[in-house]
Amino acid sequence: MGIIACSGEELLGGTLSRAAARIVVEKLRPQETIILCAPLFAAGGLERHGGQEERNFAKEHPTITIEGCEEECAKIAVDKYSGPPAATFNITEFIDAHPKLKSMSREDLGEDGMKLAEIIAEEIAKKVDELFIRK
């Protein structure tokens, strides 16, 4: 299953989305998931760099997008080039649901930010499990 995280660097949500994606892929569901490169996916046509491989993977396998803000760039790209994502998570919803967990900054999530990334990753892992059961 593919995971495409926000690649935005200006917002805390982008950093949290990438941290959560790494937790899912490296710790929680390493056998079931891979990270797809968002810029390469969007650029496409860069065969020497595997651009079509990213899009083709998302066409053939369920893909989850993790959005750092309401713009939903990853979801829009997956919709456009590979079909609808299997699920989309918006980091803003998690930030709003856990107001006591305050990240230090987008450059340094701190302990609370990493706890929030873990919570997000756990929810994504549940969705991975749900999608694998449906297959």
Where do the PLM segments sit?
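Iron-sulfur-associated redox domains of electron-transfer enzymes in respiratory
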Residues: 1-135
